[in-house]
Amino acid sequence: MYLKRIQNRLRKQLKLYKTYGFASLIDDILNGIRVWSLDANHKTTTIHEGSISGADKAYLTIVELAETDNQIFQKFKSNRQYREILEHVDRDTGQKYLDALNEYGNLSPKVVEFCKFDQCKPFRYSYYGIGRVSPSNLRYAKIYLDIQMLFGSLNGMRIAEIGVGYGGQAHIINLVSKPSLYKLIDIPEVVKLTLKYLDSVGLKLITDDNSESFSDNYDLVISNYAFSEISREIQENYLRNIILKSKRGYVIYNDILQNQVESIKVQEFIARVPGSVIIKEIPLTGSKNNLVIWGHQSINGLVQS
């Protein structure tokens, strides 16, 4: 078994070397130095039923530790257990995001600045034309440019994000644009970590302190692989109080729950959200993934291949 793992590892390394050259070996060494695992003595007692991440004890433990312990905070993105939930965009998918970014033309200095952020020690890979960057940052940047192409300037908009991770999408949006409000909607532990992360990169969001209270309306709602990963009860609350009160929307829908939890599937979602349409997710990160949008200007300028 051990020999087989070594053989598989060597085959993978050879494939990477043929595709990306010597830099791929250096990347793996450096990422191998960064990666770490949670001590078995650290266990959270907190559980949030109704979502994949909220019910994962190891993930919630890392979130809580990163928010309260600055040493953990400085490296939480490279934690093995955390990467099972977030920060798991691989090298090849990162290249696809970069290809899509390049199709949008010359990237602004602030977008490039964001892509190169190394805060909290994510895995990074070498890409031609941009250097060693986190593939997750490339994804957030590509989604930002999608949103800008679909909806125009985000300046002055009241934005709500459902499922905020550690604040990667909020980071680039508030770095490059100036929303009048950015509502973070997630479990309390995640919102606390997100606010700490955004503060660490010099961003002060105009938001409120309660992720359970909602404004009368929003100009844009965003959800990347999150709305589709929660139970119907929570979905109905968000649908009623956020989505149906938002003029525009960008929701990446996945099928990770399948039949594990009763939830609103994508066809029901578009039937209930006026003006919503399904377009192809680029790059496609899951065979049944869909991108749902509404309130958009046009999809003519959107990268679609």
Segments the model singles out, each with a brief description of its role:
Residues 2-133, 302-303:
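N-terminal accessory regions of S-adenosyl-L-methionine
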